[in-house]
Amino acid sequence: MACLGPSAQVPELPEKNCGYREVQYWDQRYQGAADSAPYEWFGDFSCFRDLLEPELRPLDRILVLGCGNSALSYEIFLGGFPDVTSVDYSSVVVAAMRARYAHVPTLRWETMDVRALGFPSGSFDVVLEKGTLDALLTGEQDPWTVSSEGVHTVDQVLNEAGFRKRTSRLLGLHTQLELVLAGVSLLLAALLLGCLVALGVQYHRDPSHSTCLTEACIRVAGKILESLDRGVSPCEDFYQFSCGGWIRRNPLPDGRSRWNTFNSLWDQNQAILKHLLENTTFNSSSEAERKTQRFYLSCLQVERIEELGAQPLRDLIDKIGGWNVTGPWDQDNFMEVLKAVAGTYRATPFFTVYVSADSKSSNSNIIQVDQSGLFLPSRDYYLNRTANEKVLTAYLDYMEELGMLLGGQPTSTREQMRQVLELEIQLANITVPQDQRRDEEKIYHKMSIAELQALAPSMDWLEFLSFLLSPLELGDSEPVVVYGTDYLQQVSELINRTEPSVLNNYLIWNLVQKTTSSLDHRFESAQEKLLETLYGTKKSCTPRWQTCISNTDDALGFALGSLFVKATFDRQSKEIAEGMISEIRAAFEEALGHLVWMDEKTRQAAKEKADAIYDMIGFPDFILEPKELDDVYDGYEVSEDSFFQNMLNLYNFSAKVMADQLRKPPSRDQWSMTPQTVNAYYLPTKNEIVFPAGILQAPFYTCNHPKALNFGGIGVVMGHELTHAFDDQGREYDKEGNLRPWWQNESLAAFRNHTACIEEQYSQYQVNGEKLNGRQTLGENIADNGGLKAAYNAYKAWLRKHGEEQQLPAVGLTNHQLFFVGFAQVWCSVRTPESSHEGLVTDPHSPARFRVLGTLSNSRDFLRHFGCPVGSPMNSGQLCEVW
């Protein structure tokens, strides 16, 4: 019996059944398919999932025959199988599917007749067909007695898909398979001859054989071409030139406020992780990996989560002492509630406390205290009340809705939540803006707990820190680094003058924010309404499994990384990446030698620091050692039955891990990103750059792509992170990772003059009429500019050593131009206006468009290779250069 899944309204049927065989019918039927709901023959993927998934592997190359406008291909992708090609002989529906799923580049859509597929032999591991043969056989009079024409049609499809039956009785001494193979051999011989003729023509036209005609080169050339906008001059707007086509083909997916290369790769990585965790044959010798699966499965237990509703959080609030919003509360327990909320459950009301390397003595860890306590992304949302009235109203509505879901009454809940919001506004008033915190020498203050107590006496710091870092014994002389003494002093005064009931409501509100993502769908729906106002997202269609992968990554990221690395990471990639870093470092150091503004003593120290930068590629070694991996998560209890309790256990466990670090030196094995993360970073206290396995893939890096693209992709990322060691903050740390003045005054003054040019340049850029903050983004802008220059110089050095490489076919770009296009296309991006505003006020990076335009307009090499004249939009005539 057919499984009846959700589907679109039944469309107009053909006059006769045989009409199903005609492409004209399908072209007419699929007019407007890009905007209509999928139509599922026999049912959707969920109806067949139990049958299919045991037969599929994550890296299978899957072909879907007669895809129509079904969501099957996309659902297979979401199921953890990223390599899916779909064919249909209606060009109308193929165009619609390309548009609908343009945000998923691994899904391919081709116009083909299933009776005459155009793929090379061996192109696929799995072929799926759901209703296509039925459509082809609608002309049959009797379903039990198929005509010879019908048999021939089925034969054609099976043959094209790679299946044949033996019929030796009909064909005498030779089986049909043998005859087919003989025919295929003749066909391949003809194709080979045709290829040789074509190549001969190509070689005749291109005597130097300078064009790369490998499959990889042809594929990447196609992707580059479809991303370009040839209607725009590269000297007018290089971002639009490089990304205009990509932007047209990539409308924002539902539920997303932004979409770019990083999001796309993370979705692919998540699909792989899903398959690994849901594999019915999952069997690991590592307890940490087993915990990872249990945690993930507990997150998927939606029925259990819905059944519990808000009760787990209500019970937790009662255990802590109650909440004035929802019922009785203990009025004399400020310190006890603070210890529970900020200590046991790791929320961050008023301030945040953590253990990390001491910036001025990087071989030892120390307690650190910094400003915190705001729920909205930035203080600007609270203080610019006229511009952000919609957001503040939506936030108050959200606060009220959660309070009522937890047992509050409508009138009293809104009033009490309004008081909490007013307290957050007062916190925003004393919070120091990020662009005023860039000089770490100025904001670093080391003191004892006794001195901290004198600075901020509204709470007992020794009691709080001793509870947080239990079982360690702390005394009044224990050193603490405070970032922002003025802030803490004012917070203390704010606590003293605030009503106890408001303080209690604010503290418990911080706990509620921390834990509601582990509760039922009502809390999720409330958050979605706030996010729609804050980021402009439409209602999220994010599958539950994706949410659970992200949660698992947060909780057990390195155990998850162990599974990811073993399934996907090629050790050769690590060796190649290390070689590229060496080349880029050499190019950076060579450029150091040509800087006219830097004195010799500072230059030598800078070279020594560059030499000392430690690079970490792929993953930390301990994750592949089961015992070492298990030790990392020893003490973290994970059950498959209670997602909420797993999250509480995680907060408590992380507090214990933090306490354990205080008396130990910092470890290089302690990464700040998990291996599956699509990103990279520089850490000044270790003077190290880290490139997780997740980013070492296309479009950043592919071993069989032209070097121009690899240097323009991952090469610029490497140069970017290396340059962070010498941006306005990184340059304050020496080669050992210690915050100390090591620059000569004259060079420091010259550096500041050069960075002032960058700051002023980027401050002129606007998004939707709102200016960028050139001070806030200064470090990232310096790194973008320096990274591009170092990577391009490294590419030129590679060419000098290895000679010119072949060019890509059809793109019409030299390899030097291709380097810059490759760099720009990494940053192709779309986002909502609300998300763009949020980025401007919170993100230390410039918007993607200006990461391209700002950087390239300062590049002499770019301007030369594209011939941009002075006075053109890409060449103002004034270049800002630091490194």
Swiss-Prot record:
<feature type="topological domain" description="Cytoplasmic">
    <location>
        <begin position="1"/>
        <end position="178"/>
    </location>
</feature>
<dbReference type="Pfam" id="PF05649">
    <property type="entry name" value="Peptidase_M13_N"/>
</dbReference>
<dbReference type="GO" id="GO:0016485">
    <property type="term" value="P:protein processing"/>
</dbReference>
<feature type="glycosylation site" description="N-linked (GlcNAc...) asparagine">
    <location>
        <position position="745"/>
    </location>
</feature>
<feature type="binding site">
    <location>
        <position position="66"/>
    </location>
    <ligand>
        <name>S-adenosyl-L-methionine</name>
    </ligand>
</feature>
<keyword id="KW-1015">Disulfide bond</keyword>
<dbReference type="GO" id="GO:0010002">
    <property type="term" value="P:cardioblast differentiation"/>
</dbReference>
<feature type="glycosylation site" description="N-linked (GlcNAc...) asparagine">
    <location>
        <position position="384"/>
    </location>
</feature>
<dbReference type="GO" id="GO:0000139">
    <property type="term" value="C:Golgi membrane"/>
</dbReference>
<feature type="glycosylation site" description="N-linked (GlcNAc...) asparagine">
    <location>
        <position position="279"/>
    </location>
</feature>
<dbReference type="GO" id="GO:0032259">
    <property type="term" value="P:methylation"/>
</dbReference>
<feature type="binding site">
    <location>
        <begin position="113"/>
        <end position="114"/>
    </location>
    <ligand>
        <name>S-adenosyl-L-methionine</name>
    </ligand>
</feature>
<keyword id="KW-0862">Zinc</keyword>
<dbReference type="InterPro" id="IPR042089">
    <property type="entry name" value="Peptidase_M13_dom_2"/>
</dbReference>
<feature type="disulfide bond">
    <location>
        <begin position="212"/>
        <end position="217"/>
    </location>
</feature>
<dbReference type="GO" id="GO:0008168">
    <property type="term" value="F:methyltransferase activity"/>
</dbReference>
<dbReference type="InterPro" id="IPR018497">
    <property type="entry name" value="Peptidase_M13_C"/>
</dbReference>
<keyword id="KW-0511">Multifunctional enzyme</keyword>
<feature type="modified residue" description="Phosphotyrosine">
    <location>
        <position position="39"/>
    </location>
</feature>
<feature type="binding site">
    <location>
        <position position="130"/>
    </location>
    <ligand>
        <name>S-adenosyl-L-methionine</name>
    </ligand>
</feature>
<feature type="transmembrane region" description="Helical; Signal-anchor for type II membrane protein">
    <location>
        <begin position="179"/>
        <end position="199"/>
    </location>
</feature>
<keyword id="KW-0378">Hydrolase</keyword>
<feature type="binding site">
    <location>
        <position position="41"/>
    </location>
    <ligand>
        <name>S-adenosyl-L-methionine</name>
    </ligand>
</feature>
<feature type="region of interest" description="Methyltransferase-like region">
    <location>
        <begin position="1"/>
        <end position="160"/>
    </location>
</feature>
<feature type="topological domain" description="Lumenal">
    <location>
        <begin position="200"/>
        <end position="883"/>
    </location>
</feature>
<dbReference type="InterPro" id="IPR041698">
    <property type="entry name" value="Methyltransf_25"/>
</dbReference>
<keyword id="KW-0968">Cytoplasmic vesicle</keyword>
<feature type="disulfide bond">
    <location>
        <begin position="757"/>
        <end position="880"/>
    </location>
</feature>
<dbReference type="GO" id="GO:0007507">
    <property type="term" value="P:heart development"/>
</dbReference>
<dbReference type="GO" id="GO:0046872">
    <property type="term" value="F:metal ion binding"/>
</dbReference>
<comment type="similarity">
    <text>In the N-terminal section; belongs to the methyltransferase superfamily.</text>
</comment>
<dbReference type="InterPro" id="IPR008753">
    <property type="entry name" value="Peptidase_M13_N"/>
</dbReference>
<feature type="binding site">
    <location>
        <position position="26"/>
    </location>
    <ligand>
        <name>S-adenosyl-L-methionine</name>
    </ligand>
</feature>
<feature type="domain" description="Peptidase M13">
    <location>
        <begin position="211"/>
        <end position="883"/>
    </location>
</feature>
<dbReference type="InterPro" id="IPR000718">
    <property type="entry name" value="Peptidase_M13"/>
</dbReference>
<keyword id="KW-0479">Metal-binding</keyword>
<keyword id="KW-0489">Methyltransferase</keyword>
<keyword id="KW-0808">Transferase</keyword>
<comment type="function">
    <text>Converts big endothelin-1 to endothelin-1. May also have methyltransferase activity.</text>
</comment>
<dbReference type="Pfam" id="PF13649">
    <property type="entry name" value="Methyltransf_25"/>
</dbReference>
<feature type="binding site">
    <location>
        <position position="780"/>
    </location>
    <ligand>
        <name>Zn(2+)</name>
    </ligand>
</feature>
<feature type="binding site">
    <location>
        <position position="724"/>
    </location>
    <ligand>
        <name>Zn(2+)</name>
    </ligand>
</feature>
